[in-house]
C-alpha cells in the first residue's frame, strides 16, 4: 500500500488583486480516508486476477435517499460570501421561534425554499459569511479560567468577533479614562503601540460537518476548512493556502467510540474564471488612458517649464509659524503680525497678504511663566531686484513686526507688547524669538485703568519698534519715551531663496558666504572676470620672458665680471 503525501503547511497566504472580490470562486473537495482509498495508489500491474474488485460492493441506500458514500466524498464550488447552510442551520431555522434577528428570518425563508425545491445540494461542506455570528474560538478567544471544560458564552463569541487594535494593551496613560488626551512626551513603546492601522475586513469561513454517518447537524463535529479575509485594499488572506501542486490537507476527528474516529482529506483550489484576452486588452487600454489623463492633470498643475526669475533678482519664499508667546501678564492672548518690505528694491505680488492675526489662546503654566501655544501658520513671498548698480550700500532685509494683545471677559483688549525680528538672510529653518515691550504711563491711575476697564497706550506706527521706514533723519531720539519690558514671541521660519546667482559654479562664487554677497557681486561679474583674465595673461607673459633670459642672469649666484 502506497503512502499518501499530506500537506502540513497550514499557514496563511496573502494575495493582492485589483479585480472585484465577487468574482472569486473556490473548489473544495472533501473525502473520508478509508482503506479503499489507498487502492488507487497501487499500480494496476500488481492487481491480480484473484483479487476481488471492492468497487463492485455498493453500500445500501439510506432511507433519506442518500447513500453513505455520497456523504464520504463531496465537492462544491463556492463564491465569495456565498451562503451554504449546514444540517444544524436547516434544523434550527425551520423552527420560527428560534429566529431572533432579521437575518435569522431571512435565512428561514431561504431554508424553506430549499426544502420545497428538493433540499440542499451540499451535505457536509457549508459556509459562514461575514454577517453570521460565528467566531473561530480557537483563533480569537482566550480562556478566562484554567478549566478544560470551559465553554464561551454568547457575549464572548460576539466580542471575539470585534477586531481590536491592540490586544495587548499595557500601560494606560492617566489615572482615568480620557484624563490625558495628548501625551506631550511619548515614549518609544507608546509610539510603537499607538501606531496601528485599523483596516476593515470581511471574513468568510468554509466549514465541514465531519460527524459520523447519520449524525450530522451537531456543533461539536464542525471544523474549519479554510478562512478567507479581504480588506478594502484588495488584499486577500487565505488560511490555509490553495492546494495547487501540494498534497491535500488532513483532518483527524476523535469520537467517544472507535467507529466515530475518522480521518479526512480535502483540497482547496482557485477556480475563478480568467479574463478573456479581449477583456485584458480593454482593461489595459482603460488603465493607460486613466494614467495618461492623470499625468496630464499633474503636468497642468506643475507646468511644463521651471519658473525662473529675472537675472540679478532674488525670490524669497517664507513658510512661517507663530509658535508661542510667554511671560505676559494677562491671559487670552492673540498676536497681530505683519511683514514690512524695504521701500527700495523689494516688491511682492498683489495677491500676497503680508499680515495676519492669530486665534485667541489660553495660557498654560510652564515653570514660572505662562505660555500660549498658537501654532499659527502663514506664508508669503517677496522679490528683490538690485537695479542701481552704483549704490554700494548693503540691501535692506524685510522685517517681521508683531503686536501682542490680550482679551478680557468683556471683549476688551489691551496691548501687551510690541516686537520685531529681521528675517533670516540665509535659507533654511530658523527659530527666532522677539522680545517685546509696551509703552507705559506713570502713576497708579493709569495702571488701574488698564486693569479694570482695559485700554492702554498704543503706538500710532508699529514700525516705531525699530527705525520707521518713513524716517529720513540721521538720528532717531526716543528720549523721554517710557516703556516696560514684557514677554517674548517665538517664530519658526522656513526660508527658501531662488536666484540665478546660485547657478554660478566658479571659485569666486563658492567663496561667497551669503546671498547678499552673491547679489552684490552679480552685476560686477563680468568686470571681475576681465580683471582676473588680464592678470593671468600678464603673469603668463612674465613667465615666458623669464624663460627666454640666459640662466647666468637669472641665477642668484651669478657675479659680474
UniProtKB/Swiss-Prot annotation:
This is Tectonic-like complex member MKS1. One of its GO terms (biological process) is regulation of canonical Wnt signaling pathway. It comes from Rattus norvegicus (Rat). It comes from the Eukaryota. Part of the tectonic-like complex (also named B9 complex). Interacts with TMEM107. Interacts with TCTN3, AHI1, TCTN1, TCTN2, CC2D2A. Interacts with FLNA. Interacts with TMEM67. Interacts with B9D1 and B9D2. It is found in: Cytoplasm, Cytoskeleton, Cilium basal body; Cytoplasm, Cytoskeleton, Microtubule organizing center, Centrosome. Component of the tectonic-like complex, a complex localized at the transition zone of primary cilia and acting as a barrier that prevents diffusion of transmembrane proteins between the cilia and plasma membranes. Involved in centrosome migration to the apical cell surface during early ciliogenesis. Required for ciliary structure and function, including a role in regulating length and appropriate number through modulating centrosome duplication. Required for cell branching morphology. Keywords: Cell projection, Cilium, Cilium biogenesis/degradation, Cytoplasm, Cytoskeleton. Residues 314-442 form the C2 B9-type domain. One of its GO terms (cellular component) is MKS complex. Pfam families: B9-C2 (PF07162).
